[in-house]
Amino acid sequence: MVKQSRSTRGRLGGLPDPERWAYAQGGHELRCFRWAHPGKPAFLLVHGIGMGHLTFNRFIEAMLPHAEIIAVDLPGFGDSPEPEAALSIADTAELVAAAMRAATTERGIGPLIAVGHSMGAQVVSELAAAHPGMVDRAVLFAPSVNAAERTLKQQAKRMVQDLFKGKPLIAIVVGVYEYLRTGPRWFLKKLGPTLEHRIEDTLPKVQQPALVLVGSRDRVTPPEWCYEVALELPHGELTVLGGPGHEAMIAEGEAAAERVLHWLEG
């Protein structure tokens, strides 16, 4: 079910107001945000755990002259209401697919270049594998979960290390704001399915061209792990962005956009 949402200004700083709508299915609702640019490639942005589409702010700003952007807030994150139970990663991908099918019918949105950050990369991998007609290319930014550290204790340790490893102020401010909106209860509910999902089992099924991006100081999904991710992709490439950690999408959105655009042209 699709519900139109009233446009408001202010959340995304200097960005123009997007078209907004909600999509609900089976007690789970996600919010969609679209910056239309007819004739340009359509990008779908899927955020990580504890976050919302605001984490892509700088990436969106850099991409707007070159692309149409559709960003989502997954159930319980950003502007989307919290459901009673957390979906698996695969079921989350199916919810996103249903929302995009509806958007294709109602708004004429074509094949997508799907971009996922952290947990969002897990969702994008499932989406690309299950719906090759919908996803033309995939970008996996800091894809979780590192197979060598798939426990709550290890992930918590790495998140703390990453937080205090020279993270830029903008990444801290946006990250704290989004985590506070999510709240610890829902974060932990969604963390279970995130840790259970094995992205390495899905990667060989992704037949589209795929780009893996990671910050050189990422402690949560380090470059060594992302190299393994790229190797598992039939048509994968890896780029390491100098400097930033796990929230490089926030701190280095412009650099990420530049690399993605260069990849599309190659």
Show which residues each predicted segment covers:
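Active-site loop/oxyanion-hole signature of alpha/beta-hydrolase fold enzymes
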Residues: Y23-H28, F33, A71-I113, E258
